[in-house]
């Protein structure tokens, strides 16, 4: 049975969230002399002399309305990497506890475990990059504090089967974190819609992919108010900058632009997949619910990778054993996709 309070590290249970004098003031202050800021303004071109809202209230309100949740169910972070690290720190005691990962998958779960001196238990995905019945049973039986499930998965691109995730949610005693960094490209409802059913569910999303805002570093976590309240206890006071909050609000006010880009990338994925399928050096293109295509090349993916680099085309070469012989190809703008395909055809001719 899931019991959040018993999972939280004892030292965190007694912590209180950061509070400033401005939290005690209601309304709009006429004179602010509490935080030792520079009241004369900024040395740069814009007015950033005041600290940002540490609670990111305006952004959370806009996101809550967009996602259909309460603002108290939203946590914002300096990229998803920060909230992954915070979740590990929230529950797992250094040198004592463990977390779960399902490779091949996003590498930051392993990094967060190592940084926090927490053991990493790995339950490998099956050959089709799905959770097997045996894998699900191992996850449920584990005494780990957290299981991270990346869906759509990076670097494989596929959604994990919803029934498998639901089994883990119903059986695992710790937090189940579903990382939906690429969820906007998938034809499936977000797990945010299931938060009311599962108090042990945390859903991660990001502004870095479909929103096209990787440079502002803004991640999102959606969970029960209780989980979010604990995260607020341990985050740094001003973890999301004023500039990031302004840019996020501007993006959230123009969801039409977001949807247009999303549709263009989905069409680009389809077009790129069709072009790759015609190339003899392409052995297999794995099904993708993301903005990239994991592609197996023959006879030598490494040679293809080096050929592309020599022509100024940078793709990702997965390092995990289950992805041997593959390259991860991001769906770019049409001109970038065309350049990629042309370079691959050139490799065939040269070979």
Tell where the protein language model's regions lie, with residue ranges:
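N-terminal "arm"/small-domain region of PLP-dependent enzymes with the aminotransferase-like
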Residues: 1-58, 62-65
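Phosphate-binding glycine-rich loop
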Residues: 56-98, 116
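Conserved PLP-anchoring active-site segment centered on the Schiff-base-forming lysine
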Residues: 90-112, 124-126
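Active-site pre-lysine segment of PLP-dependent enzymes
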Residues: 114, 131-142, 155-176, 180-213
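PLP-dependent enzyme catalytic core of the Aspartate aminotransferase-like
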Residues: 163, 307-311, 316, 320-351
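PLP-dependent aminotransferase class I/II
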Residues: 200-278, 284-285
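Conserved PLP-binding catalytic core of the aspartate aminotransferase-like
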Residues: 265-266, 278-311, 327
């Amino acid at each position: 049975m899931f019991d959040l309070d018993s999972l939280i590290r004892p030292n965190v249970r007694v912590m209180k969230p950061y509070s400033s004098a401005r939290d005690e003031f209601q309304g709009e202050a006429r004179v602010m002399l509490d935080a030792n800021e520079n009241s004369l303004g900024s040395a740069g071109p814009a007015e950033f002399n005041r600290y940002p809202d540490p609670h990111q209230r305006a952004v959370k309100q806009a996101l809550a309305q967009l996602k259909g949740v309460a603002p108290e169910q939203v946590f914002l972070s300096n990229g998803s990497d920060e909230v992954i690290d915070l979740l590990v720190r929230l529950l797992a005691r250094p040198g004592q506890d463990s977390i779960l990962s399902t490779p091949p998958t996003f590498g930051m779960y392993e990094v967060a475990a190592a940084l926090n001196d927490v053991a990493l238990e790995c339950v490998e995905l099956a050959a089709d990059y799905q959770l097997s019945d045996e894998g699900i049973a191992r996850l449920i039986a584990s005494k780990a504090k957290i299981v991270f499930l990346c869906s759509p998965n990076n670097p494989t691109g596929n959604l994990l089967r919803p029934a498998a995730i639901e089994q883990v949610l119903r059986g695992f005693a710790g937090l189940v974190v579903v990382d939906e960094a690429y969820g906007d490209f998938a034809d499936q409802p977000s797990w945010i819609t299931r938060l009311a059913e599962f108090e042990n569910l945390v859903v991660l999303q990001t502004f870095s992919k479909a929103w096209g805002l990787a440079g502002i570093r803004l991640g999102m976590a959606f969970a029960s108010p209780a989980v979010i309240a604990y995260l607020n206890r341990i985050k740094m006071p001003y973890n999301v900058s004023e500039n990031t909050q302004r840019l996020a609000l501007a993006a959230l006010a123009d969801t039409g632009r977001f949807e247009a880009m999303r549709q263009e990338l989905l069409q680009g994925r389809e077009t790129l997949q069709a072009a790759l399928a015609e190339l003899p050096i392409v052995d297999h293109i794995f099904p993708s619910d993301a903005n990239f295509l994991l592609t197996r090349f023959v006879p030598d993916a490494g040679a293809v990778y080096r050929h592309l680099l020599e022509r100024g085309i940078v793709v990702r070469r997965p390092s995990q054993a289950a992805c041997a012989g593959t390259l991860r190809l991001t769906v770019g703008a049409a001109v970038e996709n065309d350049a990629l395909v042309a370079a691959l055809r050139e490799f065939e001719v040269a070979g």
